[in-house]
């Protein structure tokens, strides 16, 4: 898992971050597309 995975997951689950914010973390290389799918529950699409 990426270093920020748990923190990003907790932000998303708490409603502090939207799906678009988590998606931006993938494009910035902070988390992987696979981690996005685990957090959001949807397939990552650019």
Predicted regions: what is each one?
Residues 1-46:
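Viral virion structural and adsorption modules
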């Amino acid at each position: 898992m990426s270093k920020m995975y748990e923190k990003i997951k907790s932000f998303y689950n708490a409603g502090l971050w939207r799906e678009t914010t988590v998606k931006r973390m993938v494009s910035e290389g902070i988390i992987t597309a696979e981690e996005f799918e685990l957090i959001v529950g949807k397939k990552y699409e650019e």
